[in-house]
């Protein structure tokens, strides 16, 4: 026997005591608040690591992940036992519903909340409702807790850095979190009842095991009964010569509570080489003896038997792996604990798991009369009671890679669809991100407007966002009906058309406007506006004149107790001696005294309501860019006011690419976007012309710096540019290639998740949100009763 195994067996040897109560079955002797457990003679510590997008990665990325994971395995300490665990945990239905459903408020919106909640429940029922959590547990023999803590501190830092290289976040679990894992497994269906307070426990003289153990454990030869649940533990008995990297994914892809664990015992390389050399020497000796016997029988041409030749070949390959390919010898035990409500269900699930193993040419077997030992081995406690070791190299062990696909299920998150791979709900809380900037990208008909409206509906209906303001720049007149239906008296829909009654003052400026000098910022805005009006652009002389006049207009208006307007600016321009000032004044004439004076005089729109839609559909294509610019400036004023009041603002800007058609408007909008972020706003840009966006350095920088991007179906040229800018693989980009409406990719922080989002058509919300002719309610139409 290898020295490492001999030493480990000696260390793990415990005196067996007959358990007198259920608590005695749990092999943890003592716990510390930092999450260190004493299990037998060993100290153990558990770390939780997040999933990464392995299944949807390209072949090159998969190889890179595989090699990085191999490095992690190679870094494991040979003096400790490492356990990698995948925990399929069913979400508690009551907790789940509380976390995702909107509470009713007793107002007219409850009908819409009911529709939205029913949609969420239908999706949740269709989803498997299983949360997959992944842990790595280190167990080591140390003299005392101080030595153990020092060891775990060093090993933990090493693990965190290795997982970070994979793109996975690794965090250590404290005692409460580790006990919760055990409680949720032992007492399934009672997850919400877990309460653990170490101080109270000691005060009452209780054991920590009292808070996690099942009501009873019945032992049978091939299954256990934990309280009212049935449990069976299997182990991997026989391995195939070649195993695919998706075996672990398929084994754990069950809509059931289960624990899959791999116990790893690394062997020091010098010891491993010595062992393999001894084995090879034994094989060579056997071959020599066989040949000597053949020669004695005058059989000088005999061929060495196949099994001996195979042993020699495999031993040489193994030795070569250890000495020249930086592989390590590992001993591994794989256990799988599955649970069910009935014995029949347990038998059915067992057969399903066995068939998955057979598909991969492996053999899983049920542990006979060792079920309790198997359970303690499968759980992330740090115990190992099963000795069904298999000798593997680092590479062959790395094939059992535990990664699948990233999930986004934030507490207090907003629904954005279902994960296209795991079918779990995607719940995003943008407050958790580094910045709250968002982009909705897609070709016409891909579902951009619908996605934006669905988000707006959620914000207007959910009580958590009741105090937030929503401001929408609406170039196509698509959002008014929805906002009016859900907002009623709290909503303003401003229809900005030539000669209309709704007006906006382009020169309006609140206190605190801009990042530094408000006059300079407003001057920049006016330059952008004139550039939109006069396509010849704004030269250096024009800029000087505009800057001078803007600085003069505001103090004069303030003295007379009025609000400065574009009419005042035009008048001031006419007073200037330069001819170019007269040119600028002439450009502004149409917007001040002409037929398009809706931005030249004092505002008539009620901007104090929480929900405001700026509908510029009637402006025409020529004037929309200027209208979008004025609206952005108006929104910036409102965001600044809300920021001072401690209020959050959600900003939606459709046809976003228009802002970057000219240099000055691009500079102004880049500054405005930056201020949105700094002043507590959640800006969302919506566009179908991704190519225009990416041609602008400023716009592409804004896009790449955004933490939240929803990519729906993309045109071929846009796909290539997006993939390059956001570093997305071809496999991942396939989800935005000829995708159905409402399907695509979400980039959420560092996560990249394919999603499917389909809303039920037989609802009033759908009629308010869809833009399909004949199905939806649009700006000028009657809202359904």
Spell out what each predicted region is.
Residues 1-402:
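Extended, folded cores of ATP/NTP-driven motor/assembly subunits in large transport
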Residues 52, 59-78, 85, 89, ...:
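P-loop NTPase motor domains
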Residues 432, 444:
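The conserved Walker
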Residues 440:
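Hydrophobic anchor at the beta1->P-loop junction of P-loop NTPases
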Residues 448:
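Conserved lysine of the Walker
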Residues 451:
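Hydrophobic positions on the alpha1 helix immediately C-terminal to the Walker A/P-loop
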Residues 458-471, 489-491:
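Post-Walker A helix-loop "phosphate-sensing" segment adjacent to the P-loop in P-loop NTPases
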Residues 488-494, 698-711:
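A short helix-turn-beta junction within AAA+ P-loop NTPase domains corresponding to the substrate/partner-engaging
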């Amino acid at each position: 026997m290898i020295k490492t195994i001999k030493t480990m067996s000696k260390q793990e040897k415990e005196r067996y005591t007959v358990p007198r109560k259920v608590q005695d079955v749990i092999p943890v002797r003592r716990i510390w608040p930092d999450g260190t457990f004493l299990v037998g003679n060993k100290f153990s510590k558990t770390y939780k690591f997040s999933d990464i997008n392995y299944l949807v990665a390209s072949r090159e990325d998969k190889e890179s992940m595989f090699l990085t994971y191999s490095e992690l395995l190679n870094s494991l300490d040979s003096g400790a036992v490492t356990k990698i665990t995948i925990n399929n945990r069913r979400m508690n239905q009551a907790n789940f519903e509380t976390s995702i459903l909107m509470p009713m408020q007793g107002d007219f919106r409850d009908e819409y909340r009911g529709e939205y909640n029913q949609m969420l429940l239908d999706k949740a029922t269709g989803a498997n409702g299983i949360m997959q959590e992944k842990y790595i547990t280190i167990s080591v023999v140390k003299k005392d807790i101080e030595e153990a803590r020092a060891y775990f501190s060093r090993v933990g830092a090493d693990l965190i850095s290795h997982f970070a290289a994979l793109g996975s976040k690794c965090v250590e679990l404290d005692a409460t979190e580790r006990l919760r894992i055990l409680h949720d497994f032992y007492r399934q269906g009672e997850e919400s009842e877990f309460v653990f307070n170490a101080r109270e426990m000691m005060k009452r003289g209780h054991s920590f095991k009292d808070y996690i153990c099942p009501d009873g454990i019945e032992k049978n030869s091939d299954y256990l009964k934990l309280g009212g649940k049935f449990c069976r533990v299997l182990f991997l008995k026989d391995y195939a010569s070649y195993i695919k990297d998706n075996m672990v994914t398929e084994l754990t892809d069950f809509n059931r509570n289960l624990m899959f664990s791999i116990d790893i015992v690394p062997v020091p390389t010098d010891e491993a080489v010595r062992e393999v050399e001894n084995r090879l020497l034994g094989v060579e000796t056997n071959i020599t003896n066989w040949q000597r016997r053949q020669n004695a029988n005058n059989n000088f041409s005999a061929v060495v038997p196949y099994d001996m030749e195979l042993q020699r070949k495999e031993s040489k390959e193994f030795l070569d792996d250890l000495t020249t390919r930086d592989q390590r010898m590992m001993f591994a035990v794989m256990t799988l604990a599955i649970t069910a409500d009935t014995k029949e269900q347990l038998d059915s699930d067992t057969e399903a798991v066995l068939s998955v193993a057979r598909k991969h040419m492996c053999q899983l077997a049920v542990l006979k009369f060792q079920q309790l030992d198997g359970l303690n081995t499968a759980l992330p406690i740090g115990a190992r009671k099963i000795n069904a070791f298999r000798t593997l190299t680092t590479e062959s062990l790395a094939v059992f890679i535990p990664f699948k696909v990233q999930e986004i299920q934030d507490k207090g998150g907003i629904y954005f669809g279902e994960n296209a791979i795991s079918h779990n709900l995607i719940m995003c809380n943008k407050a958790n991100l580094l910045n709250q900037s968002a982009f909705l990208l897609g070709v016409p008909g891909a579902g951009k407007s619908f996605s934006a409206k669905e988000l707006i509906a959620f914000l207007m209906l959910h009580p958590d966002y009741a105090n937030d303001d929503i401001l929408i720049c609406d170039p196509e007149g698509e959002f008014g009906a929805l906002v009016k239906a859900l907002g009623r008296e709290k909503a303003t829909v401003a229809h900005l058309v030539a000669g209309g009654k709704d007006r906006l003052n382009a020169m309006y400026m609140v206190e605190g406007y801009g990042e530094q000098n408000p006059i300079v910022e407003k001057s920049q805005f006016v330059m952008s506006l004139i550039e939109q009006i006069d396509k010849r652009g704004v030269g250096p002389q024009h800029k000087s004149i505009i800057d001078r006049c803007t600085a003069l207009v505001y103090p004069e208006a303030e003295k007379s107790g009025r609000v400065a307007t574009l009419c005042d600016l035009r008048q001031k321009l006419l007073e200037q001696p330069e001819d170019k000032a007269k040119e600028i004044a002439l450009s502004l004439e149409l917007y001040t005294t002409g037929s398009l004076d809706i931005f030249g005089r004092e505002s008539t729109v009620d901007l104090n309501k929480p929900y405001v839609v700026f509908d510029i559909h009637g402006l025409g294509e020529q004037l929309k860019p200027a209208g979008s610019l004025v609206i952005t400036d108006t929104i910036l004023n409102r965001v600044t006011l809300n920021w001072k009041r401690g209020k959050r603002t959600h900003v939606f800007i459709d046809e976003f690419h228009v802002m970057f058609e000219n240099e000055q408007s691009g500079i102004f909008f880049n500054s405005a976007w930056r201020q949105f972020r700094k002043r507590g706003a959640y800006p969302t840009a919506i566009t179908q012309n991704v190519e225009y966006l990416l041609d602008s350095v400023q716009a592409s920088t804004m896009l790449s710096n955004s933490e939240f991007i929803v990519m729906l179906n993309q045109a071929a040229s846009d796909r290539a540019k997006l993939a390059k800018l956001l570093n997305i693989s071809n496999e991942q980009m396939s989800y935005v290639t000829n995708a159905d409406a409402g399907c695509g990719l979400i980039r959420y922080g560092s996560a990249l998740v394919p999603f499917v989002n389909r809303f039920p058509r037989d609802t009033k919300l759908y009629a308010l949100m869809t833009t399909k002719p004949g199905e939806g309610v649009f700006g000028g139409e009657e809202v359904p009763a």
